[in-house]
Amino acid sequence: MPNDPPPAYNSHPFNVVIFGESGVGKSSLVNLIAGSPLADTSPDAAACTFASRPYHVVLESCKAYCIWDTIGLNEPEISREDYLRAIKHAYKLIKDLERSGGIHLLLLCMRGRITKSVQQNYRLFVNVLCEKKIPLGVVITHLENEPSMDGWWIANERVFKSYGIATNGHACITTIPGIDGVFKDRKEESREKMRDLLLELTMPTSEGWRRESARTWFTDLMGGMMKMLPGRSRRPTNKELMEKLVRECGFSRKDATAIAGSIEVIREQPESESGSETSGSDDGGS
């Protein structure tokens, strides 16, 4: 169960953050990697961005992983309400990652189209949360009916490049449970692909990345996320931010005031060139 205490390790496990839209199969991917039903695969309509659950998995040679099943953005645009709901989950995720050794790997889980939501998730997790410091693996799900699952990547790799989505590895898979043995071979193939991808992208000498403090990391994340709000939307006020920071994150009013002010400063900074890397005009993929 996700709330059970983690196993004891001689050192921190590799922290792998899986992110993507709801319904793409993130929880099923956790179960595929683990080889057992660790994660609940039923949809959670009330899920908020950055809400996460850790699952502990040991692969070959006793290589330990903590897989963070993380809620990403489900809409092409972030709303003011989405932003405010995400605050407590973002702070908890960052605190958990900071004290457990940082992030070693990001996995973008998606279906076979690069939607606006996929682009926004890439920007939020790769550019903002991890400042492009972390390897990214892309996992394409729901490919069980393709003539060749790997053939999908051959046909669509150029689309990722055209959207500025830089990957360090990929896996074209299915996570479908299967009925009466249907897709059994493809699911076994998919499990091997995922384990190979994890082992390839987390070398024994890999060190987790994190900012100098959880507070700085959190402040920069929420400032970067604030910049992603549409220009026409009403932004959260300093008072609203402060109330959330005090009530849901446990900051003192003095600290909450300082953090809210820093978020506003970040929001006012000019957009860097990297901010438009995934600004394709149409959905991509087949």
Predicted region positions:
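Conserved GTPase G-domain substructure that encodes guanine base recognition and part of the catalytic core
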Residues: M1-S286
